[in-house]
Amino acid sequence: MSYIPGQPVTAVVQRVEIHKLRQGENLILGFSIGGGIDQDPSQNPFSEDKTDKVNGWDMTMVTHDQARKRLTKRSEEVVRLLVTRQSLQKAVQQSMLS
Amino acid sequence: MQDRLHILEDLNMLYIRQMALSLEDTELQRKLDHEIRMREGACKLLAACSQREQALEATKSLLVCNSRILSYMGELQRRKEAQVLGKTSRRPSDSGPPAERSPCRGRVCISDLRIPLMWKDTEYFKNKGDLHRWAVFLLLQLGEHIQDTEMILVDRTLTDISFQSNVLFAEAGPDFELRLELYGACVEEEGALTGGPKRLATKLSSSLGRSSGRRVRASLDSAGGSGSSPILLPTPAVGGPRYHLLAHTTLTLAAVQDGFRTHDLTLASHEENPAWLPLYGSVCCRLAAQPLCLTQPTASGTLRVQQAGEMQNWAQVHGVLKGTNLFCYRQPEDADTGEEPLLTIAVNKETRVRAGELDQALGRPFTLSISNQYGDDEVTHTLQTESREALQSWMEALWQLFFDMSQWKQCCDEIMKIETPAPRKPPQALAKQGSLYHEMAIEPLDDIAAVTDILTQREGARLETPPPWLAMFTNQPALPNPCSPASVAPAPAPAWTHPLPWGRPRTFSLDAVPPDHSPRARSVAPLPPQRSPRTRGLCSKGQPRTWLQSPV
């Protein structure tokens, strides 16, 4: 079984809500994003934390630039992310067993 | 000229030392000697420095030493004057007005100092050129004691200058004046940035002869700093960093509060000054004061206290007057062992004390009464002391306490907590100091517990085989063109962090490769990044070769 890009995917996600920080006249989140549908995933130094949705916008099929734009909208003070990571699965399994 | 300056300097030092000796004030003399030696050390270090940041630390030490030497000098002169005046005007010992009551000393501690900045640059995110940095520190003076905070590097990414130090002054009176001075210097060489004021100095230096002229110029320029007289303590370094006074303020008892307060800063420099920083104009801090009368016992001794309701049976107790209470212990040892006192009588601003003719009717001499108002009731305790002298000394202690409370005002309402400052670590290799964002570490582990709780409640099904979505993490492409959803780089990063080249908030950014200077995104691969948007999300014909990362 493997993940086919472009096909709908069901995954265990974690909802993360981040309030942007004010730095001078700008609002920033304070972290970096990498990747995008137009990027080469084999060069990803990390394999954690994939973002599925940002404030309702689907992120599973976005380019790097689109992703960045969705996260840095000036009008939004809060960003709500649906994030998935590998360790979520382990955590779920552990809780089921206990 | 140079030799003359040397001689003048030596003469001055000699004069200072002689003054200290003649006063036979060993404490002050020792402190002065210590500062003079520290100053010599700082001068040598400054001459030997190669790196700008070392030079900044050494110059800061020099400035602090100079300030201390001057303030000790001032103190010495004051004491000398007092001594001389004391000798000439002789007062007969049994006449003259009684000594004026002086308030007790206290400990004053200033902590959590924060100075907000006000960057007006609307081009914040498009940082042009190099990041301009400043080195700043605070000099705090109370009486003749001077202390400094650590030096902090400031740049455009900081919203405030926050000092971690706690500064404690141990022997303050309630009329204290705590002077706060903010000094700043450019981290980069000043030469590139300054213009006018240097021209005159250059002219002067060239007309006097190069090396001596430079000395004079250096000392003239530093005269604007801590107010050190240029001839007395000329700055030896040439072309070293120079601190300028950026702002100052004076805090007094009125500013003391067990909490944070904001105070106004008087700005002392203007935009032409190379070390000028856009200060918002205020300073926030916690200024606490602990008068000694609250933390140390001011009187103790044997007392007989009238038991409630029993007219004749008076208990013998050991009384300790401390803070706003008179504790009556069964035995003297109880005060030290932490035993509960038999009785505690409040002695505060509202209390009334009377030496007692009140109880002559009971036939007990040497009594005093302490009355407190609790709502509508007045509660009076009557205490008998051992002798007339004991009564007088108790009354004296109580009057002194009332006086102290009237002088220290709000500090006597409740004891303000003061932490003894930890000894400051010597300045390490100065890493670029980040902003608040450095401390932001989002801990996902806490959230996982919440997630799994919800899942166990809802699903209940056992997930034994790995679900299909986990394949997203295995990096095995199903199609020839590998694509993946946008990844978010986690905030707590592994050990390797590289500073961003253009000064965005330095998050734990995950740059694997030394960055280039493109403004927003950095390309890891050697090929230029493919930035053409693919709205359909379908991968392009050629394989994407890049892994872009952008701060958001």
From Swiss-Prot, chain A:
Residues 12-87 form the PDZ domain. It comes from the Eukaryota. One of its GO terms (molecular function) is beta-catenin binding. GO terms for cellular component: cytoplasm; nucleus; plasma membrane. Detected in kidney distal convoluted tubules (at protein level). The modification N-acetylserine is found at S2. Coiled coil: none annotated. Gene3D superfamilies: 2.30.42.10. It is found in: Cytoplasm; Nucleus; Cell membrane. Keywords: Acetylation, Cell membrane, Cytoplasm, Membrane, Nucleus, Wnt signaling pathway. It is a peripheral membrane protein. GO terms for biological process: negative regulation of cell population proliferation; negative regulation of protein localization to cell surface; negative regulation of Wnt signaling pathway; Rho protein signal transduction; Wnt signaling pathway. Transmembrane segments: none annotated. May regulate a number of protein-protein interactions by competing for PDZ domain binding sites. Binds CTNNB1 and may thereby act as an inhibitor of the Wnt signaling pathway. Competes with LIN7A for KCNJ4 binding, and thereby promotes KCNJ4 internalization. May play a role in the Rho signaling pathway. Interacts (via its PDZ domain) with GLS2. Interacts (via its PDZ domain) with RTKN (via the C-terminal region); this interaction facilitates Rho-mediated activation of the FOS serum response element (SRE). Interacts (via PDZ domain) with ARHGEF16. Interacts (via PDZ domain) with KCNJ4 (via C-terminus). Competes with LIN7A for KCNJ4 binding. Interacts (via its PDZ domain) with CTNNB1; this interaction inhibits the transcriptional activity of CTNNB1. Interacts with ADGRB2. This is Tax1-binding protein 3. It comes from Rattus norvegicus (Rat). The lineage of its organism: Eukaryota, Metazoa, Chordata, Craniata, Vertebrata. The gene is Tax1bp3.
